[in-house]
């Protein structure tokens, strides 16, 4: 099953101070690469770039993004159909951030699950999630 990476998972990985958390995120990322099940919505790249840039600066953000881009995950671009599906999810779930709607729509389209502990996702019918 495809696993759609949410920004919260990647930011947990990049910001992990706890060795156990870092070990678990590394293990998950390695398995997703090895099994070619990892999916990276393009909106997540934007969210991660912004968060790391604000926290650690532009150079650090670019370094992390280069590593992420070379990790071999399938990058899903926001196309018109996905945008429509995300917009309709937003209409039904007004408190769900638009980026999360795009991530949820990606998971629903691919029949995958979102790697996140974000409680927003539990509101979307038929959406599966997993965490470290």
Where are each of the predicted segments found?
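Active-site neighborhoods of divalent-metal-dependent phosphate/nucleic-acid chemistry enzymes
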Residues: 74-115
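Anion (oxyanion) recognition and catalysis
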Residues: 33, 69, 108
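Histidine- and aromatic-rich ligand-binding microenvironments
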Residues: 5-6, 40-42, 95-97, 118, ...
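Short, well-structured N-terminal submotif of metal-dependent ribonuclease cores
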Residues: 1-40, 53-66
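Acidic, PIN/NYN-like endoribonuclease modules and their adjacent C-terminal/linker elements
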Residues: 104, 108-132
């Amino acid at each position: 099953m495809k696993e759609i990476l949410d920004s919260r998972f990647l930011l947990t990985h990049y910001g992990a101070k706890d060795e156990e958390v870092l070990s678990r995120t590394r293990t998950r990322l390695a398995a997703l690469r090895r099994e070619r099940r990892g999916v990276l919505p393009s909106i997540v790249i934007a969210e991660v770039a912004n968060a790391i840039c604000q926290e650690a600066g532009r150079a650090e953000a670019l370094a992390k993004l280069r590593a992420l881009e070379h990790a071999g995950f399938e990058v899903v671009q926001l196309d018109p159909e996905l945008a429509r599906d995300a917009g309709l999810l937003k209409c039904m779930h007004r408190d769900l951030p638009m980026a999360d709607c795009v991530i949820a729509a990606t998971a629903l389209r691919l029949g995958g699950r979102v790697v996140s502990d974000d409680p927003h996702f539990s509101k979307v019918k038929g959406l599966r999630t997993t965490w470290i």
